[in-house]
Regions:
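Dual-mode signal for accessory low-complexity, basic/Gly-rich regions
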Residues: 241-304
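Short, conserved, surface-exposed binding loops centered on an aromatic residue
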Residues: 211-213, 223-224, 231-233, 258-260, ...
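Internal helix-turn-beta structural module
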Residues: 278, 284-348
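A short, structural micro-pattern
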Residues: 163, 215, 262, 285-287, ...
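Structured core elements
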Residues: 158, 168, 222, 231-233, ...
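Long, well-ordered mid-to-C-terminal structural blocks that present hydrophobic/aromatic surfaces
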Residues: 218-254
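Active-site lining segments that contact anionic ligands and/or coordinate catalytic metals
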Residues: 19, 218, 229, 236, ...
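Active-site bordering "gate/hinge" segments
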Residues: 1-220, 225-227, 327-349
């Protein structure tokens, strides 16, 4: 992508203004957190974006900085406070990292009186400049807002997977949110490339269980992300068991036993970026028209659970576990089949 093309996207999505401070942020390998080729290329891409922002800043009147920090080693684990303090004076932060820092970075945007807006781009790849990054974001905005409204009106979601498994996700007492590709105003936080509507499921936390009862989230959750298909048994919005006795199943049991909060069903997300393609990269896969479900932290999405990570499972067409149908059960007892035959129904958005 040429500099002028980048700058057009920067203006549309980020709208940096005269007098502002723009920061391009990367994480770096250290100690036993080893480098890899994709990570190296991402840091090169970050440098290219930094240079493009600098050229744009000369004309517009904003300044640009480039900062590095030692990688955390886990997706959405906490970034140390001293790092957050050092970057908190930036007006616009572009975080092009190996390990997602979204759950920490969003706290800078949520602070009272915050002047910071952030685009989190974990595992971004340069090829995305030709796919999801180049989407028509006015169109994406419209789709994401429609999904947000649908999720807010729903009490639950019934999901049928191609494996024959079913899962009900409790959406009571929660509000839908959208990631629509707008990072132009202070306090805004986006995942970029963007394009999804999402909601944190109802967990039945201590401060709400008396009024709303236990979570009704229950069923079998397939996981495509670990080389072979794994299935989790879910009850009351928690992963209570990993099905099977394979080596991979035992590994997953140990993973969840390290921190009980990892068991929390943290997100139901619906991707809606027509330019996104499936390649195995979660950042873009979850923006493809379809479903993703996450476990771990939900507190920064409107839920109640804080964990040491937030991991997404995507269900695009072509993987061992697809979503055949996803039906929203509304508060007025009506139903909306949002995904049919493994395809998001863009025509109803």
């Amino acid at each position: 992508m040429q500099i002028d093309e980048k700058q057009k996207i920067f203006e549309e999505i980020f709208a940096p203004k005269s007098g502002e401070k723009v920061l391009v942020l990367v994480d770096i390998p250290h100690n036993d957190i080893l480098d890899n080729e994709a990570w190296k290329k991402r840091r090169e891409m970050a440098k290219e974006w930094y240079e493009s922002f600098k050229e744009m800043g000369k004309k517009t009147g904003f300044t640009v900085d480039f900062k590095k920090y030692n990688a955390t080693g886990l997706q959405n684990t906490l970034i140390p406070k001293d790092i957050l303090d050092k970057i908190s004076d930036a007006n616009l932060i572009i975080a092009m990292t190996e390990y997602s820092g979204s759950s920490s970075l969003i706290t800078l945007c949520n602070k009272k009186g915050s002047n910071t807006r952030i685009a989190s781009m974990p595992k971004v790849e340069k090829r995305m400049e030709k796919t999801a990054i180049k989407a028509n974001y006015s169109e994406v905005n419209s789709y994401a807002n429609s999904i947000k409204k649908m999720l807010t009106k729903a009490n639950g979601a019934e999901i049928i997977f191609s494996t024959g498994d079913t899962l009900f996700i409790d959406l009571r007492n929660r509000k839908g949110k959208s990631d629509k590709g707008d990072c132009s105003k202070k306090g805004q936080f986006i995942n970029f490339p963007s394009g999804e509507g999402f909601i944190a499921p109802y967990e039945g936390a201590a401060d709400e269980i008396k009024k709303f009862g236990e979570s009704k989230t229950k069923g079998i959750l397939p996981d495509n992300q670990h080389g072979k298909l794994i299935k989790y048994r879910v009850e009351k919005n928690k992963i209570v068991d990993v099905i099977g006795n394979s080596k991979k199943a035992e590994e997953r049991r140990r993973f969840f036993s390290k921190n009980d909060t990892r068991r929390n069903i943290a997100e139901l997300g619906i991707g809606c970026n027509p330019r996104a393609v499936v390649t195995g990269n979660i950042l873009e896969d979850e923006k493809v028209g379809g479903l993703h479900i996450a476990y771990g932290s939900s507190n920064y999405l409107g839920g109640k659970t804080k964990s040491d990570l937030h991991n997404d499972i995507c269900f695009p067409k072509g993987l061992p576990a697809e979503v055949k149908t996803l039906t929203l059960m509304n508060k007025d007892n009506s139903k909306i089949e949002l995904i049919r035959n493994s395809r998001l129904r863009y025509e109803i958005l």
